[in-house]
C-alpha cells in the first residue's frame, strides 16, 4: 500500500476548515472518510438545532465530496474528562480553557483511538491551523501559516506520537484561501462563520449556562483601597483583566478610567477591582505553571530562554523558564505582563515550534 493510499478519518464539525481539509486530503491521494462527533447531550431545543444543523452541513459536504460520514457519541467521555474538570476549576475561582482540555481528551484521544481501532485509520485529520514537521524521528508541532488563525496554543498537550498520527491540511494555508476553496467547490460551509462558543457546547449565553451547574454566590466588589463600590453576581463570571459587565462607573474622587478585575478573594467571595488596564495590581513579573506537557515528552530540567503566551492571540513574551521540580516551572518575563490568569495555560515557543506548556498555578505579582 503506497503512503498516499493510506486511510484518513477527518473530524467533520460542519465548519469550513474541516470541510476543506477533507478535500485537500482527497487531492493528495488519501483514502478519506469523515467522522462527526457528538459530545454533548442536548438539554434544550436551541442546542439540538445547532448540533443537528452542524451534522446536516457535515453530511452535505461529505455527499458533495463523495466520502462516507461516520458518527460517534463521546458525550460520556466529554462530561467525565472535560466538563466536570471545567466546572471544578470555575468553582475554585480559576478560569479554565475547555478547548485545550477537549483537544487533549476528546479530539486527540477518544477520536484518535476510535478512528484507529474501530475505523482502521492510519491517520486522523482536523481543521486546526497548525503544522507538523518531522525532525530526527519525532513529530513537532508548528504554528499555523496564518499567524492570525494559529491554533497551536490549544494543542500544546499533544505528544509527538499523537502529532505523528495527525494531519492538519489547512495549517499550510491562510483563512481567506480556505474560504475561497470552499466557495469554488460550492460547499455549504463556505460562508459559515467560525464558532466561538465553548468547545462542543456551542454559543450559548455563558452566564446563564454556567448558572445551571454552579449556583452563583453574589458578593462584594471592593477597590484595591478597600472601598466597597458594588456587588458581583458570582466570582465565576469574572476573570482577571475583565472590564465589561462589572456594572460600575468611575468614582467621584477618582478618574473616569474604566474598572478592571485585578484579583479574586475566593475565600471571602470578594471581587477586587482597580482603574486602568495597566494598574500595578494587574501586572505580573512571571508565573508558576504545573501539569506540564512537553511535545517531545522529554523531562525539562535546568533553565531555557524562549517565548510564552499566557492567553490565545497574545503577542509572544520573551521569558526565562526554570524547572522547580518534575511538574512545576517558574517563568520570569522580560517585561511585566497584564492579566496573567490562574487556570489558563502558559504555552512556550522556540520560533515556529510549539514546545509545550502547562496550567498557570499562580502569578508572580509586580512588587508594589
Curated annotation (Swiss-Prot):
Segments of this protein annotated with the region Interaction with tRNA: 149-151, 311-312
UniProt-listed GO biological process terms: tRNA wobble position uridine thiolation
Active-site residue numbers: 102 (nucleophile), 199 (cysteine persulfide intermediate)
Catalytic reaction annotation: S-sulfanyl-L-cysteinyl-[protein] + uridine(34) in tRNA + AH2 + ATP = 2-thiouridine(34) in tRNA + L-cysteinyl-[protein] + A + AMP + diphosphate + H(+)
CDD domains: MnmA_TRMU-like (cd01998)
Keyword field: ATP-binding, Cytoplasm, Disulfide bond, Nucleotide-binding, RNA-binding, Transferase, tRNA processing, tRNA-binding
Coiled coil found in the keyword field: no
Sites where the protein binds ATP: 11-18, 37, 127
Localization of this protein: Cytoplasm
EC number: 2.8.1.13
Annotated segments matching region Interaction with target base in tRNA: 97-99
Function: Catalyzes the 2-thiolation of uridine at the wobble position (U34) of tRNA(Lys), tRNA(Glu) and tRNA(Gln), leading to the formation of s(2)U34, the first step of tRNA-mnm(5)s(2)U34 synthesis. Sulfur is provided by IscS, via a sulfur-relay system. Binds ATP and its substrate tRNAs.
Entry similarity comment: Belongs to the MnmA/TRMU family.
PANTHER family in alphabetical order: MITOCHONDRIAL TRNA-SPECIFIC 2-THIOURIDYLASE 1, TRNA 5-METHYLAMINOMETHYL-2-THIOURIDYLATE -METHYLTRANSFERASE
Subunit details: Interacts with TusE.
Protein name: tRNA-specific 2-thiouridylase MnmA
Organism lineage: Bacteria, Pseudomonadati, Pseudomonadota, Gammaproteobacteria, Enterobacterales
Amino acid at each position: 500500500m503506497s503512503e498516499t493510499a493510506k486511510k484518513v478519518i477527518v473530524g467533520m464539525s460542519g465548519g469550513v476548515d474541516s470541510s476543506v481539509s477533507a478535500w485537500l486530503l482527497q487531492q493528495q491521494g488519501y483514502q478519506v472518510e469523515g467522522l462527526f462527533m457528538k459530545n454533548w447531550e442536548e438539554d434544550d431545543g436551541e442546542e439540538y438545532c445547532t448540533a443537528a444543523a452542524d451534522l446536516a452541513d457535515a453530511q452535505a459536504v461529505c455527499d458533495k465530496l463523495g466520502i462516507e460520514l461516520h458518527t460517534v457519541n463521546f458525550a460520556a467521555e466529554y462530561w467525565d474528562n472535560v466538563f466536570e474538570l471545567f466546572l471544578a476549576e470555575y468553582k475554585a475561582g480559576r478560569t479554565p480553557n475547555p478547548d485545550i482540555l477537549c483537544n487533549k481528551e476528546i479530539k486527540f484521544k477518544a477520536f484518535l483511538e476510535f478512528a484507529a481501532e474501530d475505523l482502521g485509520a492510519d491517520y486522523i485529520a482536523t481543521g486546526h491551523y497548525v503544522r507538523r514537521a518531522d525532525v530526527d524521528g519525532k513529530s513537532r508541532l508548528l504554528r499555523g501559516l496564518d499567524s492570525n488563525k494559529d491554533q497551536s496554543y490549544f494543542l500544546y498537550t499533544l505528544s509527538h506520537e499523537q502529532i505523528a498520527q495527525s494531519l492538519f491540511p489547512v495549517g499550510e494555508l491562510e483563512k481567506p484561501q480556505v474560504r475561497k476553496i470552499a466557495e469554488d467547490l460550492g460547499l455549504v460551509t463556505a460562508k459559515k462563520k467560525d464558532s466561538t462558543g465553548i468547545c462542543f457546547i456551542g454559543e450559548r449565553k455563558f452566564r446563564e449556562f454556567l448558572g445551571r451547574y454552579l449556583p452563583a454566590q453574589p458578593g462584594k466588589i471592593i477597590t484595591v483601597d478597600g472601598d466597597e463600590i458594588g456587588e458581583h453576581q458570582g466570582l465565576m463570571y469574572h476573570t482577571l483583566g475583565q472590564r465589561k459587565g462589572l456594572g460600575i462607573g468611575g468614582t467621584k474622587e477618582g478618574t473616569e478610567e474604566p474598572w478592571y478585575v485585578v484579583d479574586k478573594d475566593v475565600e471571602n467571595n470578594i471581587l477586587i477591582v482597580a482603574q486602568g488596564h495597566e494598574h500595578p495590581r494587574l501586572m505580573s513579573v512571571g508565573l508558576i505553571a504545573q501539569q506540564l506537557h512537553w511535545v517531545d515528552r522529554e523531562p525539562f530540567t535546568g533553565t531555557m530562554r524562549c517565548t510564552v503566551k499566557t492567553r490565545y492571540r497574545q503577542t509572544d513574551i520573551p521569558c526565562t523558564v526554570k524547572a522547580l521540580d518534575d511538574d512545576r516551572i517558574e517563568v520570569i518575563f522580560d517585561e511585566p505582563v497584564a492579566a496573567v490568569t490562574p487556570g489558563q495555560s502558559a504555552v512556550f515557543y522556540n520560533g515556529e515550534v510549539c514546545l509545550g506548556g502547562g496550567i498557570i498555578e499562580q502569578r508572580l505579582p509586580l512588587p508594589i
